[in-house]
Design a protein with these regions (language model features):
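C-terminal motif of bacterial Sec signal peptides marking the signal peptidase cleavage site
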Residues: 16-19
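Edge beta-strands of jelly-roll/beta-sandwich modules across compartments, strongly enriched
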Residues: 72, 120-134
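Short, surface-exposed beta-strand/strand-loop-strand elements in extracellular ectodomains
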Residues: 70-86, 130
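Bacterial signal peptide processing site
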Residues: 21-23
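Noncatalytic modules at the cell exterior or secretory-pathway interfaces
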Residues: 56-60, 104-122, 126
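Short beta-strands within extracellular/lumenal beta-sheet-rich domains
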Residues: 37-53, 97-98
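Sec-dependent signal peptide recognition
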Residues: 3-10
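Beta-sandwich interaction modules
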Residues: 50-52, 92-108, 120
Length: 153
């Protein structure tokens, strides 16, 4: 009898954990942009603009390849203020869409501009997919956005 109870408890636990992996509610809209392979230099290349009405938190997810070269930098700026400057480690094509970087960021009221660059005097080949989710949908100025990057389920 004890063995039966242990098996039932284990089965309940396994089924309960499996249920936790399924989304139970909508997270709202997602903004996503896929940049094809391009050469970066010291001049920042804008890849995505996200206008918001008021400051809000969001989850940033990105994956990239630099053909195993160091030096590419991901920037997030708003009205001349640098909100994020992340030097990207060398990454191979095999890591693209397999390894994702995830972190919470703050989007400031106004235009939040994501861009990429390489060190001065160097060029780095880069491909990136970037997405934002878990943000306050009401703060997003969708009419000022490229509709191709906004995914609303």
């Amino acid at each position: 009898m004890k063995r039966f109870i242990k098996c039932m408890l284990l089965l309940t636990l396994v089924l309960g954990l499996a249920g936790c992996s399924e989304p139970t509610e909508e997270n709202g809209p997602e903004i996503s942009y896929r940049m094809e392979q391009r050469w970066l230099d010291a001049e920042r290349q804008e890849i995505l603009r996200v206008p918001v009405e008021v400051d809000c938190k969001a989850m940033l997810h990105y994956t990239y390849t630099t053909e195993d070269a160091d030096g590419a930098v991901l920037w997030l700026e708003n009205d001349g203020e640098t909100l994020l400057m992340e030097e990207l480690a060398a990454a191979t094509d095999e890591s693209y869409e397999t390894n994702w970087q995830v972190g919470q960021i703050t989007l400031r009221a106004g235009n939040n501009v994501f861009s990429l660059s390489a060190p001065t005097g160097e060029q780095v080949s880069c491909q990136m997919t970037l997405s934002l989710d878990e943000f306050d949908e009401d703060s997003l100025l969708t009419e000022q956005m490229d509709p191709a990057v906004l995914n609303v389920d």
